[in-house]
């Protein structure tokens, strides 16, 4: 009864908060989502505390119920984060938000079976929305020039044909003879929680650059699953001030890294293979590795987010040319195929979803996405 009573109170509270915030969410999406996430995180902490309660440890009969609560909570959080990444407009998608409201109502009554059933329905509706967004991207394909060649320099939006399908790509090429790749960060040193963030436009301006792309994966503040580590990241990164972020916890890291130095670029298969040389311009560890030696190095894995179609950012090189860009309506595996078709030598996947942002010559050509703790910036030498 203690478990059911506490979770009943938690669920009712979440439901009331959700209903209160829904109307204003249409106008102030970012701030409201952050508020809801913060409160969801507090409730998650209460659930974790309950797990460690003496009564739980002594009464094995409660174990199944607690697992059921945790499973339903985790699934609800996953759906919530999917909606955040899609930046769904409530006014145009009332059905999806009504379903989410219904799920919270079931949770408030302790009806976990019905909540789980409706979470499966919600997942299908979210996938349907993704398909709708994908069809809009298909229309955009008709409006771009088709080319399977990379630009020699500057920015291009073009259609690349791969296996009978055309993918729209926004791509910028720059010579490393005249361009330096740097990383701008909001924090001056390692940060594990409540880390500062900024817009890509600000990072480009701060670095005196002419273009920029969002960086590797991080833990967004609006994700309930990021409680206690908001806006932090754990991969190796060297910024323009020659500071190595997360140096100590990447001694054995298998995450690949891309290093820019002078007029050249190189890949290392594992961050642990790289020292802490500050004579280079930048070090960017991200995953997965897409291409190396002109060959595809990524095979489909069990990460469902990588198999969903969406706008996906990348950083790449060929010879003394650096490329940054976004492939539209593609899975990670399809991005690798697109870049191989373009003759790219080496490439890393960057963060995607709500973080996808690409800035060229004073304007966004993708995004603006959410604010992030870092940005990759191209500057003239």
Language-model regions: role of each:
Residues 1-34, 38:
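Acidic, low-complexity intrinsically disordered segments
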Residues 2-17, 117-120, 124-247:
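Zymogen propeptides
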Residues 21-28, 32, 40-100, 104-106:
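Amphipathic, heptad-repeat alpha-helical segments
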Residues 166-171, 254-255, 309-314, 373:
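Short glycine-rich loop/turn motifs
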Residues 175-178, 220, 239, 259-265, ...:
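Short acidic-glycine loop/turn motifs at beta-strand connectors
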Residues 218-296:
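Active-site-adjacent helix-turn-beta-strand microarchitecture at beta-sheet edges
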Residues 225-246, 300-350, 355-381:
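Conserved, well-ordered active-site substructure
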